[in-house]
Regions:
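Aromatic side chains
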Residues: 10, 30, 36, 81-83, ...
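A solvent-exposed, acidic/Ser-Thr-rich amphipathic alpha-helical stretch
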Residues: 21-76
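Short acidic-aromatic low-complexity motifs
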Residues: 1-29
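A beta-strand edge to alpha-helix "cap/lid" segment located at domain peripheries
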Residues: 54-121
């Protein structure tokens, strides 16, 4: 699986409603002790990530999707990509920075940013 496929599967985990399927995807693409942080969260490990996604899915209306909206820009097993969350009555965009394992098959760290960058003042 290439870097783009790993990232797309990771985004799919956020959109998946079934916990068992979500956990399966996370186990496939997430390093055992991988970390995720964004302005609201900071978790370590697969189970913690699944729990975070569980909590997020409770807050969002049914049918939300998170999809990658840019090409994956990557070098030296570090990647950045834009994403968008959309669904009934909600939309959000952001950028994630992802650090991958040496073989490029698992995410070891993801740092998420919400919203577009503000122009320089």
């Amino acid at each position: 699986m290439g870097i783009e496929q790993v990232i797309d599967r990771y985004c799919e985990a956020w959109s998946t409603k079934e916990r068992a399927k979500r956990a399966e995807i996370v186990n496939e693409v997430w390093a055992e002790s991988g970390t995720y942080s964004d302005p609201r969260s900071d978790v370590r490990g697969r189970e913690a990530l699944v729990g975070l996604i569980d909590a997020a899915n409770v807050q969002f209306p049914p049918g939300i999707e998170i999809k990658r909206t840019s090409a994956v820009d990557a070098h030296h097993n570090v990647a950045r990509f834009a994403w968008a969350l959309s669904g009934e009555g909600i939309s959000m965009e952001g950028i994630d920075i992802a650090f991958l394992s040496d073989d490029g098959t698992r995410l070891e760290r993801v740092i998420g940013f919400f919203g577009p960058l503000a122009p320089e003042a």
